[in-house]
Design a protein with these regions (language model features):
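NAD(P)-dependent aldehyde/semialdehyde dehydrogenase
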Residues: 3-115, 121, 127
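Conserved C-terminal structural/oligomerization subdomain of aldehyde/semialdehyde dehydrogenase
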Residues: 70-223
Length: 223
């Protein structure tokens, strides 16, 4: 998450409060997800340990520490790009928070990393939203909320660069997963002889017109 300079701690506290209201407890909560395997849970705990060892502040949300593969959300402030959680996809309930000084600064942070699968903008004016769309790259974008572009059946969904290739959902998904077969059938009147040597001035002019768009006049240049 990118927040204005000086707002990281207040943002982390607000996120923790909202999480606690939604999930008062994590352990044994059937409405709260689990990490898919113990190996991935260990990887997430190692990311948090690395960040804390390098100076980050961890704010664990909820009223309990979770158990097994049920891990509560952890908001991480005072992060830097040397931490492992800033160098790879997290795939877990960890939210790093970076501070920015201006919209230009925030967009520079986005451009400096790999192109994300999704980008979310909250509280931006229409003009700033237009700037974000023009000056950053992302697989998809939601303004004033999160994730909703994924659920629109008539919007293409997919990544760009490291976050994936291709688009899916609706017509875009049908086209992506279908093969459009190109077929050419030559008819008898097709002037195929023009494509065989020897070439005259007419063929030269036609070729220049087709490939360059400006057919020269005059005799052919000597070889």
């Amino acid at each position: 998450a990118l927040v204005p300079r000086g707002k990281a701690e207040a943002f982390a506290a607000a996120v923790a409060d909202a999480f606690t209201r939604l999930y008062p407890t994590v352990s044994g909560n059937a409405e709260y997800t689990s990490i898919i395997t113990e190996r991935h849970a260990v990887r997430l705990r190692e990311l948090l340990a690395d960040a804390q060892a390098k100076g980050a502040t961890l704010m664990r949300c909820g009223t309990d520490a979770g158990s097994g593969r049920q891990m509560p959300l952890t908001v991480v402030t005072r992060v830097n790009e040397g931490m492992h959680l800033m160098q790879e996809e997290i795939f877990g309930p960890i939210l790093p928070v970076l501070e920015y000084d201006s919209l230009d600064d925030a967009m520079a942070l986005v451009r400096r990393g790999e192109r994300p699968l999704s980008l979310y903008g909250l509280g931006l004016s229409d003009a700033d939203q237009a700037r974000v769309l023009k000056e950053t790259h992302a697989g998809g974008v939601t303004f004033n909320d999160w994730g909703w572009h994924v659920f629109q059946h008539d919007l293409p969904f997919g990544g760009i660069g490291n976050s994936g290739m291709g688009t899916y959902h609706g017509e875009e998904g049908f086209r992506e997963l279908s093969h459009a077969k190109g077929v050419f059938k030559r008819h008898r009147w097709f002037p195929v002889g023009l494509f065989y040597p020897p070439y005259g001035n007419l063929v030269q002019r036609l070729a220049m017109k087709f490939f360059i768009g400006n057919a020269p006049t005059g005799p052919r240049p000597p070889h």
